[in-house]
Regions:
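Short S/T/G/P-rich N-terminal loop/turn motif that feeds into the first structured element of a domain
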Residues: 1-140
Length: 140
């Protein structure tokens, strides 16, 4: 078959605060679509609230984290053939240094994150998780 390259624009991100001492980790993807009342501006505002929560969690823990996220906007039409993600406007990409830190972060988020307010995007509820090994270290 033909090799196909799918490229994305990274429109928004939160960098890691510290480098992961051991390569590899866990990545997760949420695939989301904008709605009539939730567009790119609302996404940036929602990420601002998420960043505030992350800052408070890091401060409470007293240690920096290698967790980071990026918002990937496809430079191609979705869905792609054979994809289970369906059609989407952006992929919310998370990186954790381990499954343990991902599970701890998810539990903390479930317990302490502010409830969503106002319009929300249409997202696939299932988080697509993969083991990861970076080709290069993210810049800090």
């Amino acid at each position: 078959g033909d090799a196909i390259n799918y490229s994305f624009n990274v429109s928004n991100f939160r960098p890691a605060q510290t480098q992961d001492p051991e390569p590899g980790g866990v990545v997760g993807f949420n695939f989301c679509s904008y709605t009539d009342s939730f567009g790119p501006g609302e996404l940036i505002a929602a990420n601002g609230i998420y960043n505030q929560w992350l800052d408070a969690a890091v401060e409470a823990a007293g240690t920096e984290t290698p967790y980071f996220y990026t918002i990937h906007e496809p430079n191609f039409e979705t869905p792609i053939p054979g994809s289970s993600a369906g059609s989407y406007d952006y992929a919310f990409h998370h990186f954790w240094d381990s499954e343990e830190s991902r599970a701890q972060g998810a539990a903390l988020f479930a317990e302490t994150a502010p409830a969503p307010q106002g319009p929300q995007p249409d997202c696939i509820q299932e988080l697509f998780l993969f083991d990861s090994y970076p080709f290069r270290s993210p810049q800090i």
